[in-house]
């Protein structure tokens, strides 16, 4: 599920990584057996039914088969070379038994793999289970002689079960006045037949200019551009009972957005990458039993710790 940015700005970002085996990792297997857990009983595990990198976050007390929080890691890797207006995909995630399975490395709190991509780009992808969620880290190395003005490799957190929010009734962003439903400017969504509401992308600008057209339709998808900018690179979804919050944030981004059919959360950071250089991009997914206020404060306290 790819998103095209509105207006004149095209968001393309790639996340890459340097190679090298790390001594801290004590196991190397095609897929790690079992799961890694944190102090509150949350689990992080590889979804082995997919060859391409997919992780699941399992809430405390839930069965290991639970699929409420699934993260495509990453969804795609896309670059735009200097002097070009066209984006090029170096990688696109596919479900099932498709492509080559990465060689996962596992430590007590971390799952990671490395991959060489077309275009002489090397990626290290690392997921670290912390006490309040998972930090996703991409280290990207440009081994070519090309300069990439934009690199883009978003994770794709997809929420189902108790977090699924197809009409965006529990998915929030934050602006200068506080919390606001991402889709608050489209109350008609609550009455639309689903086949009219979907497929849809709902976007809110952070650093990018707000598009002049608030509703656009491209390639059979309706894009809603929120008229008011957000004041933080943050998006959160409440569970149906309001007891849990899943929130994504990063250090900086152009906009935040969701595809409600998948209830995905995007806060996709991007960077430029010169020949022979590295870039590090990070996103944090908070999974917390608490209030929106609590989770937002946690995100803002941790925001500057995310590399970009």
Identify what each model region corresponds to.
Residues 1-10:
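Bacterial N-terminal signal peptides that target proteins for export
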Residues 9-17:
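Bacterial N-terminal signal peptides
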Residues 22-88, 111, 299:
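Beta-strand-rich N-terminal accessory domains
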Residues 25-41, 104-105, 116, 204-308:
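Beta-strand-rich recognition/accessory modules
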Residues 58, 114-116, 126-128, 137-141, ...:
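Residue-level recognition of well-ordered beta-strand positions that form the cores
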Residues 81-131, 147, 151, 162:
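Extended, loop-rich substrate-binding clefts of extracytoplasmic carbohydrate-active enzymes
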Residues 129-130, 134-187:
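Acidic (Asp/Glu-rich), glycine- and aromatic
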Residues 170-223:
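Low-complexity, serine/threonine/proline-enriched polar segments
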